[in-house]
């Protein structure tokens, strides 16, 4: 199958005993095939299920009646929302629905509406407005008619939620690229060029038609008291396209034109021809402006050209912020005058702003307490939870940004800055620093910073477990302008002054670890938590050596709120310390404050094991337990034939145990009872606890040994195995820092082991060298991030851009200017700088910055960079990594990293990217000059010649860590569908998959990262079920949602584009497929650079697609490019290279280069012979081809004759199986027509079904695989 990007379902799949092909193929990019045959196409395309039927909606205005298909599983408010969004019913926003004269409650399910069935009639009844409804109606109408423009949002950055999907394949004028009759979309692709940043932005868009010049709240707003009593709600002023100004009254009955003007106030209805009234403002504007209706229709048509998902606002997720954005003068980011923009906060939340003040904690906890027995209850509960977390994350981040900028007064202004706390919008804020000395012995500020990050992960873990009656506070961590800020919902009673003798905490450590509380009501709750997280029940001792038995870590607190609920707090220590790392690299701070030795100066003691590692070690212990049990049973069976039983384990075990085999002669299988197995780790060992009794000491020693064994498992098993799998191509090779850290985390490997992995990767193998280069780049980016944060933290916001630009110049621009200058405005500096501002960044030089970053890498990752530094040619990739980590949004232009490019780049217009792929540069410059308006800034100041300027840093956005739980219901449905498909229950599987899709969309909303992953996974599964139309549609959606929620150049977005290309090709749209493949490859160059180890398969796919288009010469070029990378990655004498040589020889033959074909085939034959031996069938196949091609080269006439008979054959590029020639297959090429210039009766591009061709493209061999297994080229594997 093509790909599976749903991480959760991947881990669930790993824990299931599924052995069929669908579930075993974790490939992300490659191998769309028909492994699971499916002939039934009902299910998705058959009759509608019983709970879905059509009804009629009766309207008060034209068209008076519309049909609508509904599902009884939906709520009435879902139907209401659908009516609001339909083109014929745009104008309605304040209404209710009636059925048979009875009003329907908006908050019930449609299934609860009495007598509602097929062909029922629901009536839309317009309601009187109140002030809130009027405000929301005005907002909605402004958005509908395109008058709202772009909001300047403090949280969302420039072009947040951008999608390129609709503009891929368009040139800079916004029109499809002309390839010419003989060219393909890949015609001018340059394999070796660096990434072109123009591929990260859409071409300039044609402006949308204007329906109205402006509409805003009037200066006469709000209505005076005596008019409010008469039903006046708002006063508006509108300027039509005919330049007529109208003052409008918003009344409880609707909207009408009044007699007011800018100078006089008279809100009574106007007389004469303009005496107009309508319930909807949209209808009133249509009546007022003769051109409105036509313009509005044009606007709808303009918007209809775009995929709806690209323009919907994100409501349940924070949109991705691009790191490269257009300059302020670009047509993509024009800033238009709009008075209503300043009024939006009033329109959204009213005069008192009470609409937005929410009791977050009560909302979180009451949602948790909702019923979850029935499926519809679970759907409603999870849907509300998802929306609530999204709203909270949004509000908490906005508040954190205000705290970072110093715009909120602290509750304790006399305290030190790091100890200050804030409350804003019912959210409690504090700094991720050790302001009160809590972590004095653990590493101070560094320890506190790590602890709050781990706390978010802990809160998310507890939220996912969903333990009844155990509650958590809403938690968000925001990194902004160098500061780390924690936002938490306020737990009732947390600030309460306790009586003497009462403790602030009811379970766990109080005031350090001197006092330990152990309220018994927490025991059953923490017991469930600890069992799920493999935390061992253990004793701890307070300052008086009194023994307390705790279910969790002493650091994990329990608090009984004044609302009577039990809260779990401080969840940063759910796993044990990584004692091996701490003993090697940490030493306790000395009382004399002497400097620590360099080998023991790790910045903090909060180095814990990851939960994934604890789980993986637990599975290892289970395997050992089962093996011992099997051995015991085998020893008991003396005198009889030795049995090799198969262990039947629960889903908990997940994987086949080593040595399991079916009992040959036994009618029943032996079972291993694992109820006696238990595994848990004590999180408080090595944390200063001193056992008192001998019994406790012995138990404690055992616990310590177990934790040491887990640490040893990480260093001796997990990390080396991961490196081996990367070397052998068993897992997808990471593209960037994000995909690298994701790969490590899924294996349970902490980021602090980057240095160790780099050392272990320092071997001659090309894949390992590529891994080492990527890790070094990531360490530099992270080291720079830590240093940059330390400088940004103490700089006022107006100087942050100058600070960042100077730091970037020192990091990346040293070759262009060895002595960069910080561009701080001295006059502003004199006027507003305070003693707290630290301008030491101005004194930094490239040498001093390099020294600081190298020191950070040595400190945090225990790695000596030596002579290594930023790799030449990879400056753009490092700039991207740094920008994403710091939340930078840079102006799009060609940044010169050397003196030559800096000089040449000066002439390039800012909106345009430099020319790379072989087109005329001059034409593009001209186009950009005509499209982009000239700079309207103040006269240019003479700036020093350096790579980055302060003006290039257009914005800094927050980097957010949040604790939203996943939907268990949607995950369960997806997994059930996957299992059914794997067990060959195709119809049931398809039904479950589509149900899972519906659940994902219902619970998360459509625009959400989890939905993107679900679309991706489901598109692959549905393709294998032969539902190609649905698979293709979902593949398109996966791309758009990935772009908008993860980023246009996120690694998952690239894989989604590659998947989409394969599906388009399978559907017969090869040209469109190549456009998407090219875009993915261009993104790949920006993310990683040229020659990514896993791009071999993609280049092969493109080559085969070109052959399908009969572009034989171009196809040959792509095969050769793939071969070149394969030789670099796998070596010139590997079987992978031999197989690609074999394919390239065939491509050369199709291109009529017989001499080249013979040479390539001879190389292939020699490698097969040397590696596999003369008798291997692959060697014989190559030998047969070599003879045939040699004869053809000797006799041109014989060659043409052979080609005319269609004897040239092609082999599969295998994915899981080795890359080798296979046994003879039917002719699939039009070789005869290519060489002889004519078509024969049977000479078609493909005589097999498209599924078979797709198998060939993707590399899934239809024959029995050879037993010897080799590495890539292969499918891009989902990173486990």
Swiss-Prot record:
Sequence ranges of Basic residues compositional bias: 635-648, 1265-1280
Protein name: Clustered mitochondria protein homolog
Biased composition (Low complexity): 1221-1235
Main localization of the protein described in the UniProt heading: cytoplasm
UniProt xrefs under SMART domains: TPR
Biased composition range(s): Basic and acidic residues: 649-669, 1245-1261
GO biological process, one term: mitochondrion organization
Pfam families registered for this protein in UniProt: CLU (PF13236), CLU_N (PF15044), eIF3_p135 (PF12807), TPR_10 (PF13374), TPR_12 (PF13424)
């Amino acid at each position: 199958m093509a790909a599976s990007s749903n991480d959760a379902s991947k881990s669930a799949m790993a824990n299931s005993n599924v052995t069929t092909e669908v579930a075993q193929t974790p490939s992300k990019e490659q191998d769309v095939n028909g492994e699971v045959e499916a002939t039934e196409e009902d299910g998705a395309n058959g009759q509608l299920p019983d709970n879905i039927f059509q009804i009629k909606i009766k309207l008060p205005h034209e068209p008076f009646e519309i049909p609508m298909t509904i599902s009884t599983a939906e709520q009435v408010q879902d139907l209401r929302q659908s009516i609001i969004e339909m083109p014929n019913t745009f104008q309605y926003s304040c209404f209710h629905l009636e059925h048979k004269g009875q009003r329907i409650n908006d908050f019930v399910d449609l299934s609860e509406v009495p007598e509602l069935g097929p062909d029922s009639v629901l009536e839309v009844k317009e309601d009187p407005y109140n002030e809130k409804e009027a405000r929301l109606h005005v907002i909605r109408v402004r958005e509908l008619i395109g008058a709202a423009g772009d909001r300047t949002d403090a949280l969302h950055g420039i072009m947040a939620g951008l999608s390129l999907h609709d503009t891929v394949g368009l040139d800079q004028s916004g029109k499809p690229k002309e390839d010419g009759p003989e060219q393909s979309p890949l015609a001018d692709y340059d394999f070796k060029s660096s990434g072109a940043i123009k591929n990260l932005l859409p071409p300039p868009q044609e402006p949308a038609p204007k329906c109205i010049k402006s509409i805003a709240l009037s200066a006469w707003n709000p209505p005076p008291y005596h008019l409010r009593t008469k039903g006046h709600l708002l006063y508006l002023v509108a300027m039509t396209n005919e330049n007529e100004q109208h003052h409008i009254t918003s009344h409880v009955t609707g909207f009408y034109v009044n007699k007011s003007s800018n100078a006089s106030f008279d809100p009574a209805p106007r007389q004469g021809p303009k005496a107009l009234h309508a319930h909807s403002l949209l209808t009133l504007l249509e009546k007022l402006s003769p051109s409105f209706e036509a313009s509005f229709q044009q606007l709808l048509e303009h918007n209809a050209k775009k995929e709806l998902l690209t323009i919907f606002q994100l409501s349940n997720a924070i949109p991705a912020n691009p790191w490269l954005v257009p300059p302020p003068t670009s047509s993509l980011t024009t800033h238009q005058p709009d008075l209503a923009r300043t009024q939006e906060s009033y329109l959204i939340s009213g005069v008192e702003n009470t609409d937005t003040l929410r009791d977050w904690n009560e909302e979180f906890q009451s949602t948790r307490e909702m019923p979850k027995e029935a499926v519809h209850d679970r759907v409603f509960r999870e849907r509300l939870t998802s929306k609530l977390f999204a709203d909270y994350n949004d509000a908490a981040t906005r508040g954190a940004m205000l705290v970072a900028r110093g715009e909120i007064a602290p509750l304790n202004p006399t305290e030190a800055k790091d100890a200050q706390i804030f409350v804003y919008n019912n959210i409690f804020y504090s700094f991720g620093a050790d302001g009160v000395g809590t972590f004095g012995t653990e590493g101070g500020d560094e320890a506190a910073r790590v602890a709050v990050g781990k706390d978010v992960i802990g809160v998310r873990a507890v939220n996912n477990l969903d333990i009844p009656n155990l509650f958590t506070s809403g938690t968000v961590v925001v990194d902004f302008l160098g500061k780390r800020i924690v936002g938490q919902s306020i737990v009732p009673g947390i600030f309460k002054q306790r009586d003497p003798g009462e403790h602030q905490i009811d379970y766990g450590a109080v005031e350090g670890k001197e006092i330990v509380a152990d309220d018994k009501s927490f025991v059953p709750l923490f017991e469930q938590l600890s069992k799920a997280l493999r935390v061992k029940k253990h004793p701890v001792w307070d300052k008086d050596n009194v023994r307390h038995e705790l279910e969790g870590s002493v650091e994990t607190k329990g608090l009984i709120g004044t609302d009577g609920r039990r809260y779990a707090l401080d969840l940063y220590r759910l796993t044990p310390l990584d004692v091996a790392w701490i003993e090697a690299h940490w030493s306790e701070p000395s009382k004399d404050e002497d400097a620590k030795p360099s080998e023991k100066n790790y910045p903090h003691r909060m180095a814990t094991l990851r939960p994934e590692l604890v789980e993986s070690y637990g599975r290892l212990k289970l395997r050992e337990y089962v093996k011992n049990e099997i051995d015991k049973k085998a020893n008991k069976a003396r005198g009889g034939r030795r049995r090799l039983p198969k262990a039947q384990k629960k889903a908990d075990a997940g994987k086949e145990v080593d040595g399991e085999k079916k009992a040959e002669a036994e009618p029943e299988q032996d079972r291993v009872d694992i109820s006696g197995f238990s595994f848990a780790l004590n999180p408080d060992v090595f944390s200063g606890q001193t056992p008192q009794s001998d019994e406790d000491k012995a138990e404690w020693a055992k616990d310590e040994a177990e934790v040491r064994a887990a640490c040893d498992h990480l260093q001796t098993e997990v990390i080396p195995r991961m490196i081996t799998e990367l070397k052998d191509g068993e897992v997808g090779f990471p593209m960037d820092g994000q995909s690298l850290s994701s790969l490590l985390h899924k294996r349970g490997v902490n980021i602090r082991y980057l240095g160790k992995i780099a050392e272990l990767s320092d071997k001659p193998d090309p894949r390992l060298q590529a891994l080492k280069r990527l890790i070094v780049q990531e360490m530099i980016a992270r080291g720079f991030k830590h240093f940059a944060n330390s400088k940004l933290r103490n700089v006022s916001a107006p100087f942050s851009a100058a600070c960042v630009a100077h730091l970037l110049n020192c990091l990346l621009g040293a070759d262009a200017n060895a002595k960069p200058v910080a561009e701080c405005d001295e006059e502003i500096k004199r006027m507003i700088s305070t003693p707290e501002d630290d301008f030491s960044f101005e004194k930094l030089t490239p040498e001093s910055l390099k020294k600081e970053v190298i020191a950070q890498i040595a400190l945090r990752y225990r790695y000596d960079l030596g002579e290594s530094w930023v790799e030449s040619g990879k400056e753009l990739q490092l700039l991207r990594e740094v920008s994403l980590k710091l939340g930078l949004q840079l102006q799009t232009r060609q940044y010169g990293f050397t003196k030559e490019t800096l000089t040449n780049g000066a002439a390039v217009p800012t909106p345009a990217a430099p020319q790379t792929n072989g087109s005329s540069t001059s034409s593009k410059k001209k186009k950009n000059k005509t499209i982009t308006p000239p700079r309207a800034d103040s006269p240019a100041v003479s700036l020093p010649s350096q790579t980055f300027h302060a003006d290039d840093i257009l914005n800094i956005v927050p980097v957010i860590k949040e604790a939203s739980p996943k939907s268990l219901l949607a995950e369960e449905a997806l997994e059930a569908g996957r299992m059914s498909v794997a067990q060959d229950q195709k119809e049931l599987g398809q039904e479950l998959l589509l149900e899972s899709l519906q659940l994902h969309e219902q619970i998360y909303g459509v625009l959400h990262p989890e939905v993107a992953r679900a679309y991706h996974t489901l598109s692959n599964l549905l393709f294998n079920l032969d539902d190609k139309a649905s698979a293709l549609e979902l593949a398109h959606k996966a791309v758009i949602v990935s772009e908008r929620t993860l980023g246009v150049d996120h690694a998952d977005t690239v894989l989604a584009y590659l998947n989409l290309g394969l599906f388009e090709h399978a559907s017969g749209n090869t040209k469109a497929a190549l456009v998407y493949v090219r875009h993915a490859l261009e993104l790949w160059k920006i993310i990683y650079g040229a020659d990514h180890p896993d791009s071999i398969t993609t280049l092969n796919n493109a080559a085969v697609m070109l052959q399908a288009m009969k572009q034989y010469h171009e196809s040959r070029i792509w095969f050769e490019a793939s071969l070149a990378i394969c030789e670099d990655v796998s070596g010139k004498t590997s079987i992978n290279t031999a197989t690609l040589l074999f394919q390239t020889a065939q491509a050369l033959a199709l291109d009529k280069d017989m001499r080249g074909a013979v040479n390539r085939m001879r190389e292939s034959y020699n490698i097969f012979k040397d590696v596999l031996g003369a008798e291997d069938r692959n060697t014989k196949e190559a030998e047969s081809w070599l003879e045939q091609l040699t004869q053809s080269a000797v006799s041109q006439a014989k060659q043409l004759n052979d080609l005319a008979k269609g004897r040239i054959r092609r082999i599969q590029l295998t994915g899981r199986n080795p890359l080798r020639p296979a046994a003879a297959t039917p002719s699939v090429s039009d070789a005869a027509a290519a060489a002889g210039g004519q078509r024969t009766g049977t000479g078609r591009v493909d005589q097999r079904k498209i599924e078979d061709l797709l198998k060939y493209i993707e590399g899934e061999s239809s024959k029995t695989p050879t037993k010897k297994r080799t590495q890539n080229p292969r499918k891009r594997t989902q990173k486990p």
